[in-house]
Amino acid sequence: MCMPCFTTRPDMAQQCRACCKGRGKCFGPQCLCGYD
């Protein structure tokens, strides 16, 4: 897990991916790494 995902921020998914070095996705309030 990388960081919390806040759905109110439009760039959150992008930040999640960047935090996971290109492989991350928001699942509910969590940013999980290892997903494209």
Swiss-Prot record:
Annotated GO MF terms: chloride channel regulator activity; toxin activity
Protein name (record): Insectotoxin-I1
Expressed in which tissues: Expressed by the venom gland.
Superkingdom to which the source organism belongs: Eukaryota
Source organism (scientific name): Mesobuthus eupeus
Record keywords, A-Z: Chloride channel impairing toxin, Disulfide bond, Ion channel impairing toxin, Knottin, Secreted, Toxin, Voltage-gated chloride channel impairing toxin
Pfam family, one: Toxin_5
Localisation: Secreted
Similarity-based family: Belongs to the short scorpion toxin superfamily. Chloride channel inhibitor family.
Function: Toxin with unknown function in healthy organisms. On glioma cells, interacts with chloride channels (probably ClC-3/CLCN3) and MMP2 at the surface of glioma cells. This complex is then internalized via caveolae, thus inhibiting the chloride channels necessary for cell shrinkage and tumor propagation. Has been shown to weakly inhibit TRPV1 channels.
Annotated S-S bridges: C2-C19, C5-C26, C16-C31, C20-C33
Main localization category: secreted
Domain topic, free-text comment: The presence of a 'disulfide through disulfide knot' structurally defines this protein as a knottin.
GO (cellular component) term, any one: extracellular region
